[in-house]
Curated annotation (Swiss-Prot):
The lineage of its organism: Eukaryota, Fungi, Dikarya, Ascomycota, Pezizomycotina. Residues 254-485 form the Helicase ATP-binding domain. ATP binds at A267, P268, T269, G270, S271, G272, K273, T274. A motif (Q motif) lies at residues 191-219. It is found in: Nucleus, Nucleolus. It comes from Pyricularia oryzae (strain 70-15 / ATCC MYA-4617 / FGSC 8958) (Rice blast fungus). Residues 99-113, 708-718, 734-761 have a biased composition (Basic and acidic residues). It comes from the Eukaryota. A motif (DEAD box) lies at residues 432-435. GO terms for biological process: maturation of SSU-rRNA. This is ATP-dependent RNA helicase ROK1. Residues 68-79, 359-379, 762-775 have a biased composition (Acidic residues). Keywords: ATP-binding, Helicase, Hydrolase, Nucleotide-binding, Nucleus, Ribosome biogenesis, RNA-binding, rRNA processing.
Length: 775
C-alpha cells in the first residue's frame, strides 16, 4: 500500500503528463525553457468569416452567379467516372506515380493562385481587427490654411476664447485628415513567394530561420513595404470613405503608392520589427539588381555593390544585432550587410571642391604633427613630404549599412565646412527606435543623416514600441518640408494593440522597499527566493508566488550605481554554482570589446544576472531572459515599456517585470503604475497587480517633473554626494564604513610619510663634505 496515495486521496491535483516530471512541468512556462510558442500576441474572436469563398462578380447578376456555380459543380462531378473499368498498373508503377505527381503539381499551382489573389475587403477588416492592427493615412501634403475672421472690436477675453475655439477647430480638422486604410494582410510566410514575389533564396533563408507564423507587425507591414500596389489593390484602394469619406487628395496619393510609401510602425517589444524592415530592404536590392541585369552573386566582386539602404540604431549593441540578423537573412543572395565601425569609409559623393578639400585635409594632418616633431624629424619630413600623406581607409562596399548616428555623421561631416558628403543612391532610410533617434539627444545627428540622403525616390520608415505625439509631429513637418521640391509619397501609420503599453504576455510586480537598503534586501530575496511573496497585492495569485529564476536583467539609473551594485552582488552566488562569474555589469563607459564580450557570455548563459543601465533597454533581443528587475524607477512610461520588453520576446510566456520603489520615488511612480494597469487590461487579466487604491493614492506627475525625470532621472540618485549618502548602494553600516575609511586614510598617510622621509634623506646626502657639529 502506498501511504502517499492514501493521504492524498481527498486532494485534487493537476493532471500530469506521462513521462514528464512535475518539476519540469513547473518550469516549462518560462522564457528560458525553450518551449515553442505562438509569436502572435493577439488573435481575438471577432466573428465568423464572410460566407462563401468566391469573389463577387460586379459585371454579372446573382442569377448568373448561381448558374456559374452550378456549371462549376457539374464540371467537378464530370471529372469522376464511378463506373469506369479498373486500369491496369504498369509493372514498375511509373504511370501512377506520374499521375500522382501531376495531381500534386496541379493542387500546388491552384494553392499558389489562391494565395496570389487579393483578399476581400470584409475579410481584410476581420483579420486586421482580430490582430488589433490599426492603419492610418497621415496627411503629408500641406493643407490650405483656414481663413479666420477676427473683428477688431473684440475684447481681450472674447479674443482669447475665440483663439481656443480656433485651436479646437484646427485639432478637429487635423483629426479628420487622418483616414483609416485596410491593406492586404500577410496570412502566412508562403505568401511572400507566391503573392509578393520575393527572391527564392530569401524565402529559403526564412524557412531555415524557423520563421513559421508571422507576428502582428510582420502581418501588417510586409505587404505594404514589399508591394504597396498589391496591398492596396482592393475596392476603394483601401480607404474607408463610407463614414467621413471623400478626401480626393488622399485617394490620389494612395493610387500612386505603387512606387513605395513612407511607413511608421508602433508595435510591442519583441514582435519582429527587425525582420519587418530587413526583408523589404534586402528584397529591394535584389529586385533593382534584377532590373539592371546584375546578379551580384559573387560577393568578391565589389562593382556590384552600391549603398542603397541605411539602418540607424541608437546603440552599438542594437546595431550589431541588426547587422547579424541581416547577414543571416541575406546569406547566399550576394547582398552585403555591413556594420559601420570607427574610421570606416563608405561610398559617398562630394561637391566640386573635392580636390581642394583633400589638400586642406592633408594640411590639417601635417599641422597637427608639427608640434610633436623634433628639428631632425622636420628636416626628414621636408625631404620625404610626398610619402608622408595620411593613409585613408579603403572604401567599404556595402548594399545595406547598419550604423549609429554619430559614426555616420562624423564620416559625412569630416573635412572642412566647404565639403559636404551626400548619399544620392540611398533609396531606403530605416530608423529603428525612431522616438529616441528623433528626440533631443540624437535629433541633430539623425537629421544630418536624413538630409544627406538626396535620392528623389527615398523612402523613410520609422519603427519603435513607443512614439510620442511630438515625435510624430516632427516627422510630419520634415516630410512636408521635403514635399515642397517633389510630390511626397503617402505616410501610413500602423499601431499594433494599445499604443505605449507593455507586452501582454508578462506579469508585473510593484514592490515598495522604503529605502535603498530595502532594495538591496529585496534583490537578494529574488536571488535566493523565500517561501513568502514579495508583492504588494492584498490577494496573491500563483503568478505572484512564482519566483524569478535567472537569467534576468537588473536596470539602474547611473553607471556609478551599476558598478556599486555589481560589487555588492558578485559574491552572492555560491562558488559551486559559478560564483562571481555569474554576475556581470555593462554600461556605456566600458570599451566596445568588453561590452561585446559581456553580451556573448550572457547569450551563452555563462552570466545569470546582468546589471546594466538603459544602454540595453532598447531593441536588444535575449530570447531566454526570464525577467527584468527595475532596481531604480524608470525615467518615463516609455522607458518602462522598453525595459519590461527585454523579457517575453516573440510571444514567450512566463516573463516577470519587477519594479522597486522607495519613499523618494512615490511622486514619480504613477507613470509606471498606469502603464502596468493598461497592459494588464489589454491582456484581459482579471485582477490587476496595481490595485485601484494605489492608483488613486499616488500623486500625479507634473509636466516639469516628467521632463526632468526623463532627462536626468531621480534627483536623489544622480550622485552619492548630492544625496548625502542616502543613495549609496551598500550593505555596510556607517560604523564599518568609517572604520574602513580610517584604515585607508592611515595607510595613505603612512605611505606619504615614508616618501617624504626618503626624499628628505636623499636631499641631505647631496651636499659636500660634512662640517661637523655646530657649537
Amino acid at each position: 500500500m502506498d501511504i502517499l496515495k492514501v493521504l492524498s486521496r481527498g486532494t485534487k491535483q493537476a493532471p500530469k503528463k506521462p513521462g514528464v516530471p512535475a518539476a519540469t512541468l513547473a518550469q516549462a512556462n518560462i522564457p528560458s525553457a525553450g518551449v515553442e510558442t505562438n509569436p502572435q500576441l493577439y488573435h481575438d474572436n471577432v466573428g465568423p468569416p464572410p460566407k462563401g469563398k468566391k469573389r463577387k462578380r460586379k459585371s454579372r447578376t446573382q442569377d448568373h452567379d448561381q448558374a456559374d456555380d452550378a456549371v462549376d459543380d457539374d464540371v467537378e462531378l464530370s471529372d469522376f467516372d464511378f463506373f469506369a473499368p479498373k486500369t491496369r498498373r504498369d509493372s514498375d508503377g511509373a504511370g501512377s506515380k506520374t499521375k500522382a505527381a501531376d495531381v500534386k503539381k496541379a493542387k500546388k499551382d491552384a494553392d499558389e493562385a489562391d494565395k496570389a489573389r487579393p483578399i476581400e475587403l470584409d475579410e481584410c477588416k476581420r483579420i486586421l481587427r482580430s490582430h488589433r492592427l490599426k492603419y492610418t493615412l497621415l496627411p503629408v501634403q500641406k493643407a490650405a490654411p483656414a481663413k479666420v475672421e477676427k473683428s477688431s472690436a473684440k475684447k481681450k477675453k472674447k479674443k482669447d476664447k475665440g483663439d481656443k475655439v480656433d485651436g479646437a477647430a484646427q485639432a478637429a480638422q487635423g483629426k479628420s485628415d487622418k483616414l483609416p486604410v485596410f491593406p492586404q494582410p500577410l496570412v502566412s510566410f508562403s505568401q511572400l513567394r507566391s503573392a509578393y514575389r520575393i527572391s527564392p533564396r530569401l524565402a529559403d533563408n526564412l524557412a531555415k530561420g524557423s520563421y513559421k507564423v508571422p507576428t502582428e507587425v510582420q502581418l501588417g507591414a510586409l505587404p505594404l513595404l514589399l508591394q504597396p500596389g498589391f496591398a492596396l489593390s482592393h475596392e476603394g484602394d483601401g480607404v474607408d470613405d463610407d463614414g467621413k469619406g471623400g478626401d480626393g487628395e488622399a485617394l490620389a496619393m494612395l493610387q500612386g503608392a505603387s512606387a513605395g510609401v513612407d511607413f511608421l510602425a508602433i508595435a510591442p517589444t519583441g514582435s519582429g520589427k527587425t525582420l519587418s524592415f530587413l526583408l523589404p530592404a534586402i528584397n529591394g536590392v535584389l529586385k533593382r539588381r534584377a532590373e539592371k541585369g546584375e546578379t551580384g552573386g559573387d560577393s568578391s566582386n565589389d562593382t556590384k555593390h552600391a549603398l542603397e539602404a541605411i539602418v540607424v540604431a541608437p546603440t552599438r549593441e542594437l546595431a550589431s544585432q541588426i547587422a547579424n540578423e541581416g547577414r543571416k537573412l541575406a546569406m547566399g543572395t550576394g547582398v552585403r550587410v555591413v556594420l559601420m565601425r570607427k574610421g570606416m569609409r563608405v561610398a559617398a559623393e562630394e561637391d566640386s571642391t573635392e580636390k581642394k578639400s583633400e589638400d586642406q585635409e592633408e594640411d590639417v594632418f601635417e599641422s597637427e604633427d608639427e608640434d610633436s616633431l623634433s628639428e631632425d624629424d622636420e628636416e626628414r619630413e621636408k625631404s620625404e613630404k610626398p610619402s608622408k600623406k595620411p593613409n585613408k581607409a579603403p572604401i567599404t562596399k556595402a548594399d545595406i549599412l547598419v550604423t549609429t548616428p554619430m559614426l555616420l555623421l562624423n564620416f559625412l561631416s569630416k573635412g572642412t565646412s566647404t565639403t559636404k558628403k551626400r548619399l544620392p543612391r540611398v533609396r531606403s532610410l530605416i530608423l529603428d527606435e525612431a522616438d529616441v533617434l528623433l528626440d533631443q539627444l540624437f535629433r541633430e545627428q539623425t537629421m544630418g543623416i536624413w538630409s544627406a540622403c538626396r535620392n528623389p525616390n527615398l523612402r523613410v520608415s520609422f519603427w519603435s514600441a513607443t512614439m510620442a505625439s511630438n515625435i510624430e509631429t516632427h516627422i510630419l513637418d520634415n516630410l512636408r518640408a521635403q514635399a515642397d521640391d517633389a510630390p511626397a509619397p503617402p505616410l501610413i501609420r500602423l499601431v499594433v494593440g494599445l499604443k505605449d503599453t507593455a507586452v501582454p504576455n508578462i506579469s508585473h510586480r510593484l514592490v515598495y522597499t522604503a529605502t535603498e537598503s530595502g532594495k538591496l534586501l529585496a534583490l537578494r530575496q529574488l536571488l535566493h527566493p523565500a517561501s513568502f511573496s514579495t508583492t504588494t497585492s492584498s490577494t496573491t495569485t500563483p503568478e505572484d508566488e512564482t519566483p524569478l529564476r535567472p537569467p534576468f536583467l537588473v536596470f539602474v539609473q547611473t553607471i556609478e550605481r551599476a558598478t556599486a551594485l555589481h560589487e555588492e552582488l558578485k559574491y552572492d552566488i555560491p562558488a559551486a554554482a559559478g560564483g562571481a562569474s555569474r554576475v556581470a555589469v555593462l554600461h556605456s563607459s566600458m570599451p566596445e570589446s568588453a561590452r561585446a564580450a559581456v553580451i556573448r557570455r550572457f547569450r551563452a548563459a555563462d552570466v545569470w544576472v546582468l546589471i546594466t543601465t538603459d544602454v540595453l533597454a532598447r531593441g536588444v533581443d535575449f530570447a531566454g531572459v526570464n525577467g527584468v528587475v527595475n532596481y531604480d524607477v524608470p525615467g518615463s512610461a516609455a522607458a518602462y515599456v522598453h525595459r519590461a520588453g527585454r523579457t517575453g520576446r516573440a510571444g514567450r510566456k512566463g516573463g516577470i517585470a519587477v519594479t522597486f520603489y522607495t519613499k523618494e520615488d512615490i511622486p514619480f511612480v504613477k507613470n509606471v503604475a498606469n502603464v502596468i494597469a493598461l497592459s494588464e487590461r489589454q491582456a484581459g487579466a482579471g485582477e490587476s497587480a496595481t490595485q485601484k487604491w494605489l492608483l488613486d493614492a499616488l500623486p500625479d506627475v507634473s509636466k516639469k517633473d516628467k521632463k526632468e525625470l526623463r532627462e536626468k532621472g531621480v534627483e536623489s540618485r544622480r550622485s552619492v554626494a548630492a544625496s548625502k549618502g542616502k543613495a549609496r548602494i551598500t550593505s555596510k553600516s556607517a560604523w564599518e564604513r568609517r572604520k574602513e575609511n580610517n584604515r585607508k586614510g592611515a595607510i595613505e598617510g603612512s605611505k606619504r610619510r615614508k616618501i617624504a622621509a626618503r626624499d628628505q634623506g636623499d636631499g641631505s646626502d647631496d651636499g659636500g663634505e660634512w662640517g661637523g657639529i655646530d657649537d
